Curated annotation (Swiss-Prot):
Gene it is expressed from: tusD
Protein's UniProt keywords contain Nuclease: no
GO BP of this protein: tRNA wobble position uridine thiolation
Protein name, per record: Sulfurtransferase TusD
EC number: 2.8.1.-
Amino acid sequence: MNYTILVTGPPYGTQNSSTAFLFCQSLLKTKHILHSVFFYCDGVLNANNMTTPAIDEFNLINAWQGLNKKHQVKLYVCNSAALRRGVIEDEKLLNMNVKKGNLALSFQLSGLIELAKSIKICDRIIQF
């Protein structure tokens, strides 16, 4: 089966993101196809490379990046939701008087059109 995952919870403070990540790992281990993960609402905070968990805590941002590198899973971040929450890529900084963006590597800003395309080609969408 083809899956798209929608993550609406932040990386820390709720279990939405960590549960989504564990579910994604399970999908891939059982040979399902994970087309993409779309981060929306507070879920866009998963793409903030300035998030620094304590040394003895699981680093969920690094885990998402590892999922992308190992399995080529697309990590889409809603552009509008990201801007509202202060997550921005370097290329968008020209007019904002900000020196460095904080969009983590492996994450890609996109619009809801990417979510719609993913939903269209997948068998299941699951929201966390």
